[in-house]
Amino acid sequence: MTVKEIYGTDFPVILAPMAGITDLPFRILCKEQGADVMVTEMISAKALFYGNKNTLPLMQTEEEEKPIGVQIFGSEPELMGAMAHKIENKGFSYIDINMGCPVPKIVNNKEGSALMLNPELAGRIVKEVSKAVSLPVTVKFRKGFDDDHINAPEFAQIMEENGAAAVAVHGRTRVQYYTGEADWNIIKEVKKAVSIPVIGNGDIFTGEDAVKMREYTGCDGIMVARGAKGNPWLFREIKAALFGEKIPERPTEEEVISMLLRHAQLSVKYKGEKMGIREMRKHTAWYTTGMHGSSSLRNKVNQVETLEALRELLMR
């Protein structure tokens, strides 16, 4: 399959799945600012199987944010296939398999990035999911598990052999988490190793970074993660840079506050007032980084319980 057949565009700029961050409200904002493709937060195949009540909201989508992929994780091939089949008709454009999460409780269950230590099992998972669904199946993984197990190119080949339509590669090992610099060379190596589309991920914080990654690695698209936290405007900057257009001005403080308030309104709309406002505490910290008086503002936001109180606080 071509990049366009999977993602709907020739060089997709994708909002990476980030647990606890890339929920529906945030995805809508990023889409409005130019992100081409969304992915849900990661969803446990086991939780889906057991009907966990906290899992269903993670699959909530809106027409305006599409195309969107659903990301699942697990270590049991048959269960992964069955759960992928169960959710393939929920309006998603593709199924993404998480093989890059570095969090200890995931890794200790032999899930996420732990699968990079077991390429044979990882391949079986991709094979089962690919057999079970008619949607494209993609895989997100890392450079390797640690410096002694840097195997992304070989791992990508196994993914391709077992039916993956595309892969996304984060240029760090599991042991690195998000420290140090992302190794873009490994993305270039993966691109040479497979014939399926390769999405580059890691250290894209500006439009210039996106252009450099495209030119240096030859990747077929980019995935933006931490750079988007508190900064959905990054996508308009990236799109302008990729198209050789004038880079938009950075948002003013007034625009940041306006976006923060819109984010809060969406959060309350989809999660209810209590949960929606509490969710905004972490987002406020990201939106207001470097802003004059941000520390005091964050402390006050942490005490707020209603949308009206938040609005009054932000509009002072």
Walk through the language-model features, giving the residues of each:
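Alpha/beta enzyme core
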Residues: L29-E32, G81-E111, E120-I196
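Short, solvent-exposed helix-helix connector turns and helix-capping sites enriched
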Residues: N52, N118-P119, N231, G272
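Active-site beta-loop-alpha junctions enriched in small/polar residues
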Residues: M18-G20, I43-A45, F73-S75, G100-P102, ...
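Glycine-rich, positively charged N-terminal anion/phosphate-binding segment
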Residues: M1-V3, T9, M18-S93
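Alpha/beta catalytic cores of nucleotide-metabolism and tRNA/nucleoside-modifying enzymes
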Residues: M1-T2, I6-D10, I14, A19, ...
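Hydrophobic faces of well-ordered beta-strands that scaffold small-molecule active sites
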Residues: V13-P17, M38-T40, I68-I72, I95, ...
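Residue-level signal for the nucleotide or nucleotide-sugar donor/cofactor binding architecture
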Residues: S75, L117, P251
